[in-house]
Amino acid sequence: MTIATSSRPRDVQVADIGEHTLILRSRTWERLKFEVEYSRQRGTTANSYLIQADKKALIDPPGESFTAIYLEQLAQYLDFTTLDYIILGHVNPNRRVTLQELLSKAPQATLICSRPAANALKTAFPEWESRIQAVRFEDILDLGQGHQLTFVTAPTPRWPDGLFTYDSATKILYTDKFFGAHICEDTLFDEDWKKLDAERHYYFDCLHAPQAKQVEAALDKVVMLGARSYAPGHGPVVRYSLSRFTYDYRQWCQGQKSQDLNVALLYTSAYGNTGILANAIAQGLVQNDVNVQSVNCELADTAEITRIVEACDGIIIGSPTLGGHAPTQIQTALGIVLSTAAKTKLAGVFGSYGWSGEAIDLIESKLKDANYRLGFDTIRVRFSPTPEILQQCQAAGATFAQTLKKNKKLRTPRQVIPEAKIDRTEQAVGRIIGSLCVVTTRDQESHKGILTSWVSQATFNPPGIMMAIAQEQNADLMSHTGDQFVLNILKEGRNVRRYFSRQSTLGDNPFANLKTKTADNGCLILTEALAYLECTVTNQLECGDRLLIYAVVDKGEVLANDGVTAVEHRKSGSH
């Protein structure tokens, strides 16, 4: 497997994957966007497919990032004037840019999509109305030579216009946002599929965990098709692990639904910005073992919203501001919350706006006036979110989850005898001491720092350390092989720890008042530390509520020869 590197330019890889069928993989070896789903920084591919039978169909052209190189490469394999159909698994503003260029070259082509996608396209491009054909579940399009395409609608809150396409000739199911992974490599198929597990699971958690119910419904629709390959919108074509990957999706959905705590995430998104915020908050919740029921209020009816609100443990509402007001769907959802949700439920508010944010203020004030407690500071974002804002959203989701867990623990009746035993055990475990350290990481140009004492030397040759990190402590920046960090071992008598003693969730910069220098691996060295180690992650293991990381020490230096290591003394092993 060739892992993404930033030294290669973007390109389009073309190959045969079946009879009369080509894949065109628009590839970037760098992080494509700043959304949470791309944060593992393994690059990505935007997969498009061309079926050339008696009639020709192009499936899922990529977004604006690849428009020019994609169309240039496509022209080597297709006379645009002979293209009959363009099939869309979903529609968004990014993809519309490519569609405009493509339709100017192929004005005779018909756009095939779901009904919600057709409505969106007709609104954005009224002049296209005669060229758009909406399809329903199990509609069939015959391209000739055995290529009968069956369409399977797969709506979800994030992609209400989702559409699968199944080709009976090649038995390929084109799955768009399902069964993908953000990873760029030369391999077309999933021969080495076991090494893809981490990327696949992360992709699912980011995109589908908050909509597990709808994902299961989509899986039920395709199970009878008998597909032999999945052709996703991102990552390798699934041929060798199809049964296992399908099973994984069902298990991951069940895992979400079986969580003890459940949050209703209610939102609408006018231009996509509020939806991006919702996805980042959901990721913070999912990473902290909370089930998220994502509800796009533009699609859900009042009965469904009422049922979800009544059954959840916490409610988070997101809204854009349109003309100084919240959309009607959000006003309806807010009314349901205020009239049916117990006041003991934790709440949260977020939203995006252009010139004013009245909708966000309205929701916040209504919830506060009704005596709901907010689980994080209300998030207000003007225009498009930045990477820093998305990190704040993810941290807000983590904070919300931890507060829910604490609330549940307070409400749980205690049994006297087992509790006494637990207390004694916790007290004993708490006597384990560790060196106080600050771990510094880097996410592109953003530096992070966390305080920990859960570190020990693990190996002598090569020198290596073992460290336990909670998910909410930016564990994603150290969760895969090759990630680098600096372990700053603190010196007794210095007060460096106070800058890192609480989780920074709203953009605080703990390094602003500290002297630092940059290590060879790009992370920060605290010059007031006793010593530092530059480390590279080589192995990881999920253990309970922590990620256990083994890292090899690349280099290190003692900064204060006469200093003594700062040590944390605890009285309980529960924190």
From Swiss-Prot:
Any single Pfam family the record assigns to this protein: ODP
Keyword Oxidoreductase: yes
Note accompanying the cofactor annotation: Binds 2 iron ions per subunit.
Stretches assigned to coiled coil: none
InterPro entries per UniProt: Flavin_Rdtase-like_dom (IPR002563), Flavodoxin/NO_synth (IPR008254), Flavodoxin_CS (IPR001226), Flavoprotein-like_sf (IPR029039), Metallo-B-lactamas (IPR001279), NADH_oxidoreductase_modular (IPR051285), ODP_dom (IPR045761), RibonucZ/Hydroxyglut_hydro (IPR036866)
Enzyme class (EC, first level): oxidoreductase
Region feature (Flavodoxin-reductase-like): 429-575
Cofactors named for this entry: Fe cation
Limits of the Flavodoxin-like domain: 263-405
GO molecular function, one term: FMN binding
Keywords linked to the UniProt accession: Electron transport, Oxidoreductase, Transport
UniProt family annotation: In the N-terminal section; belongs to the zinc metallo-hydrolase group 3 family. In the C-terminal section; belongs to the flavodoxin reductase family.
Protein name: Putative diflavin flavoprotein A 4
Species this protein is from: Nostoc sp. (strain PCC 7120 / SAG 25.82 / UTEX 2576)
